[in-house]
Regions:
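Short, compositionally biased leader-like segments
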Residues: 1-13, 127-131
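Short polar catalytic/cofactor-binding loops
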Residues: 13-19
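Active-site- and interface-proximal helix/loop "cap" or "latch" segments in soluble metabolic
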Residues: 19-131
């Protein structure tokens, strides 16, 4: 039996500056955050080519709250992440924050089972909405 995740996955992308080594190949940087129901980042990854840069960015974000600490997250990235991709990473984070604002985390909808999911007792997991 597979358990349903209790987290949300958000992604954001932004253009890389011209002076980044892998800009010619990829043009954009991607950021993906896995966030729990309280808004806390539990996992993070980027499309940055260097493992040390990706790992550093992960350490900056894991444990931070995307609902309550947005300004602090951005300030931390701007202060600590001194690589050429800094601006693109911040832009990608802004796109993630916009996606969070449209999710059950920010809209106040219950974050229970996904619409149409089967509840453990075999019943419907929630009302399905279309629109």
């Amino acid at each position: 039996m597979t358990s349903e995740p209790t987290t949300f996955l958000f992604s954001g992308y932004a253009r890389l500056p011209q002076d980044v080594s892998h800009q010619a190949m990829y043009k954009r940087v991607g950021v993906v955050l896995e966030v729990d129901e309280a808004g806390v980042v539990v996992a993070c990854s980027t499309t940055l080519m260097m493992a040390s840069a990706d790992g550093f960015f992960q350490r900056l974000l894991v444990g931070r709250n995307v609902l309550a600490e947005r300004r602090a997250i951005e300030a931390l990235v701007r202060y600590r992440y001194r690589g050429h991709s800094q601006g693109a990473l911040v832009s990608a984070l802004h796109k993630i924050f916009e996606a969070v604002d449209q999710s059950p985390l920010a809209t106040g909808e219950p974050a229970g089972p996904a619409p149409g999911a089967t509840a453990p007792n075999g019943g419907a997991g929630g009302a399905e909405t279309h629109g």
